[in-house]
Amino acid sequence: MNIFRFLGDISHLSAIIILLLKIWKSRSCAGISGKSQLLFAIVFTTRYLDLFTNFISFYNTSMKVVYVASSYATVWMIYSKFKATYDGNHDTFRVEFLIVPTAILSFLVNHDFTPLEILWTFSIYLESVAILPQLFMVSKTGEAETITSHYLFALGIYRTLYLFNWIWRYQFEEFFDLIAIVAGLVQTVLYCDFFYLYITKVLKGKKLSLPA
Amino acid sequence: EANTAAKDEL
């Protein structure tokens, strides 16, 4: 464990908590892409299948449980509890264009052709593009609530910090995982446009508005 | 040979 990975996990956890609280407190999932949350639930499910078979540490196991539980709770709130507030007309990104290519790629490019490894690889590839429906929805509605932009910022920063974690691990542990690194780079690049808007607008107290 | 380091990561 290193400071970058720890801060990254904290950032990821806070993004998940921010979103849960936003929906629960406001009893509304307006502006939130249910499709992205569905993709995140798939990412965590396919990545943490070794949750019960491969104990790494109490921290690792408890974080995985929190991630899986909160992602399902978020999907449940969007598609069931508060589905009246779900803005389906603007959440129209074709997720099959994300799931199919990443699934095929995980069969072609992986470290080991075994079910667990292919599912792990699929979850890494899918996570790198899972935010696209949400970013697409924000660009379609032309703006996002401030709390949603904080959620997106925390979510984007988490994988950016993981990039530094991988530099650290390459330097000091002679370890690197090209699949995770390349996917993490793609994931971070997808946020660049949003990071720019967040830093130039939201941090100045303005509302986040994208040129529609 | 890329070590699959990322398995102990979240």
From Swiss-Prot, chain A:
The record marks D193 as: Important for recycling of cargo proteins with the sequence motif K-D-E-L from the Golgi to the endoplasmic reticulum. Residues 47-48, 159-169 are annotated as: Interaction with the K-D-E-L motif on target proteins. GO terms for biological process: protein retention in ER lumen; protein transport; retrograde vesicle-mediated transport, Golgi to endoplasmic reticulum. The chain crosses the membrane at residues 5-24, 33-52, 59-79, 93-110, 117-135, 150-168, 179-199. Residues 204-207 are annotated as: Important for recycling of cargo proteins with the sequence motif K-D-E-L from the Golgi to the endoplasmic reticulum. Keywords: Cytoplasmic vesicle, Endoplasmic reticulum, ER-Golgi transport, Golgi apparatus, Membrane, Protein transport, Receptor, Transmembrane, Transmembrane helix, Transport. It comes from Xenopus laevis. Residues 25-32, 80-92, 136-149, 200-212 are cytoplasmic. InterPro entries: ER_ret_rcpt (IPR000133). The record marks R5, E117 as: Interaction with the K-D-E-L motif on target proteins. Receptor for the C-terminal sequence motif K-D-E-L that is present on endoplasmic reticulum resident proteins and that mediates their recycling from the Golgi back to the endoplasmic reticulum. It is a multi-pass membrane protein. It is found in: Golgi apparatus membrane; Cytoplasmic vesicle, COPI-coated vesicle membrane; Endoplasmic reticulum membrane; Endoplasmic reticulum-Golgi intermediate compartment membrane. It holds the Pfam family ER_lumen_recept. The gene is kdelr1-b. This is ER lumen protein-retaining receptor 1-B. GO terms for molecular function: ER retention sequence binding; KDEL sequence binding.
